[in-house]
């Protein structure tokens, strides 16, 4: 008798254990797109969902259906509904319900994919408590993008959004009229000026420097290139400003020497007493030299007149020319102008009676 009771008890334990093992399962529960792994001994979809703390309303989407049986490794998907206060182009608001998690998904559910959110971005999450969703309808506008004109029919909350939707977003320092934040209206004309800074590297010559040697035997206004040196090569990076693709300026911002330049040698005059004052009214003296000597400051035809303004030897010497050169034709343009200025201050423009009149100097 006792042996029979014990046997029956063991059989019932075995059956109960087998049932528990068979009932225990691991499933995936996805709520509003967020999956989680749960273990359960429940069999119905609704029981597992509620067991994990989620309520299901008539507006929610639940798959499989609430009364369906769940098996090991199954997936349950719950998309909870949330209210939206939708208004179009700033007019009347109506409440709708959606199980979408993002604004973009909500517009798709509401069959409003041709509309655009006026405030939120398309990727914004829709909170479970709901949100206001003002949207705008498509508008027909003309875009002049740096001279390329096109007409588009798009929905966007403002000018910047419309340009982005059209595939030509504002970048860098681009300018747009009307302003980027302006609301889009039908028939609007948008003018875009593309302002770009581009970096370009070019290989260019590297100019040689000069070693200056002062020569006390040579007049101060003179210099002689003893050795011109040799240019090198460098890679220069320029920041190039462009307006609508047209270069408007460039500035070197970096360089790398590829081949160094060889410096030249410049011998400069340093002879005391040969200073030359700055040339004033140089265009007048050049015009006078053109009239007197065809513009040749070194002319000597043997007629007794020398240089660009045709000094005779007496005038050259009397007005201090010998400190520069024995004759005017052996002096530089600047040295001759210095002596001509002294001559003009003493004799007036009458020292050159014909040519001074022709050039309008008197």
UniProtKB/Swiss-Prot annotation:
User: Which interval of the chain is the signal sequence?
Assistant: 1-22
Name one molecular function that GO assigns to this entry: hydrolase activity
Family annotation (CDD domains) = RPF
Q: Which residues form the G5 domain?
A: 192-272
Phenotype of null mutants: Not essential, grows normally.
Q: Which InterPro entries match?
A: DUF348, G5_dom, Lysozyme-like_dom_sf, Resuscitation_pf_RpfB, RPF
Report the function annotation for this chain.
Factor that stimulates resuscitation of dormant cells. Has peptidoglycan (PG) hydrolytic activity. Active in the pM concentration range. Has little to no effect on actively-growing cells. PG fragments could either directly activate the resuscitation pathway of dormant bacteria or serve as a substrate for endogenous Rpf, resulting in low molecular weight products with resuscitation activity.
Question: Would you tell me the protein name for this molecule?
Answer: Resuscitation-promoting factor RpfB
